[in-house]
Every structure is written in structure tokens, then in C-alpha cells.
Amino acid sequence: MSSDSSREENVYLAKLAEQAERYEEMVEFMEKVAKTVETEELTVEERNLLSVAYKNVIGARRASWRIISSIEQKEDSRGNSDHVSIIKDYRGKIETELSKICDGILNLLEAHLIPAASLAESKVFYLKMKGDYHRYLAEFKTGAERKEAAESTLVAYKSAQDIALADLAPTHPIRLGLALNFSVFYYEILNSSDRACSLAKQAFDEAISELDTLGEESYKDSTLIMQLLRDNLTLWTSDLNDEAGDDIKEAPKEVQKVDEQAQPPPSQ
């Protein structure tokens, strides 16, 4: 079997796995595809399949971690130390899984995808992805490990931003998605609501001013991300009044291939 037909088969198997909601296998198939980029860069479809596969695998664990952390806080506030001890061990198991998933995609990005990227759009996509998965590590790591993950996130997002501002239109869904996640990083990880709001507002305003230039093919994705930027601005500017009232929303599944938006740590 030629490498071309093998790559084509793995892409098809990844699509089957997605339909069957077998996302761990979808990751495996797309990892095989990603390791062939030395001969030919991933297509937009392949890139999106890889992103969706990892997004679902990591998303399930992030949701589990938030639920368990919330229960841990409640048990701790009630003084149930025996339960807290059990929960900490269980949370540790989830964190091990999260670390393994993040390390997997980060290694793939560093060794194969980023070096092989030639187009500005691809570079921004992969650097944004690198920032995203370092951010997911920063969500649950503590101490020096959290600091390191946060610094790596900032470097990746800034590198992506430099290219996006120079080469992608303000309405481009990948540029908008980067602004969305970069602003979430400032808000959640660095606790800098001013920087978060400033970044989100600038991205939204710049996109609005060029909305009439938006092509039909990306209109839905771009306007949906713009709506999420606006929703977050509304939430963040009112959070002092009701800090635990609302969650920062996840992007709907239909634009997962473009972007994903983080949620805050569990409310007290």
C-alpha cells in the first residue's frame, strides 16, 4: 500500500470514528496522517479532523476535571476530609490523562506540524493549537508547572498573533478564534480582565468594520466567533456584580474545527 493510499485510508477511518463518536481512535488515525507532513502538508480538511479529534478527547477530561474539582470544593467546605482525600486521588488520575493528551498533541505540533507549515493560515492554526493545549495544562497544574505552562501559552499565542495580524484578514475565522482564546487565557489564567476585554473588543471591532468583505464560505464561522467575543465582553464587564452567575461558553460543536472556548474553574 502506498503512503498516499494509507494516508487517504486513515483520513476516511478518522471520519468513520468521528461519526461513531470513537474519538480516541480518531486521534490515532489522524496522528498517523500528521506524521506524513514531511511529504505533503495537511489539507484544511485533515487539519480540522485532527483538531476535532483532540478537542473531543481533551474536552471530555476537562469537563470531568471541573465536575470533580467542584465536588472537592464542596466536600472541603463541609469538612469531609476523608472524602476530600479520595477525591484528590481521583482528580489526580484525570490530571494524568489530561497531561498525556496535551503532551501527545504538543509533541506532534513541535516535531511535525509547525515545522512543515508553509502558509500563514496553517502557521497561525498550529501555533494557536499549541497555545490552547499549554493553556489546558495551566488550568490544572500548580506552582512552577503552572507558571511554565502559562509562559508557553503566552509565547505560542503571541507568535500566532504576530502572523495573524500581518497576513490574515480581521474577519478570518482563525484570526478571530485566536483572539477569542487568547483573551480567555488573559482572563482565566493570568487573571487580567482588562487585557482580556481589550483584546476581545479590538478583534470584534476590527472584524465588524470589515464585515462586508467576508466571503460566504466563512461567514457563519466568523460571525459565530464574533458573537462569542461579544458574549464574553458582556460577561467579563459584569462579572464584578455576579462573579459566579454565568459560565464562559464553549463554542458550539459545528465550529469546533475552527475554535474552542475555555470555561472557568468551577464556581464556589
Curated annotation (Swiss-Prot):
GO MF, one annotated term: ATP binding
Pfam families per the UniProt record, alphabetical: 14-3-3 (PF00244)
GO cellular component: cytosol; Golgi apparatus; mitochondrion; nucleus; plant-type cell wall; plasma membrane; plastid
Xref: SUPFAM superfamilies: 14-3-3 protein (SSF48445)
Compositionally skewed regions (Basic and acidic residues) per UniProt: 246-260
Region (Disordered): 243-268
PTM sites of type Phosphoserine: S69, S192, S267
Keywords on record: Cytoplasm, Nucleus, Phosphoprotein
Subcellular location: Cytoplasm; Nucleus
Task performed by this protein: Is associated with a DNA binding complex that binds to the G box, a well-characterized cis-acting DNA regulatory element found in plant genes. May be involved in cell cycle regulation by binding to soluble EDE1 and sequestering it in an inactive form during the early stages of mitosis.
Subunit structure comment from the entry: Interacts with EDE1. Interacts with DREB1A and DREB1B in the nucleus. Interacts with CINV1.
Annotated family: Belongs to the 14-3-3 family.
Protein name in the entry: 14-3-3-like protein GF14 upsilon
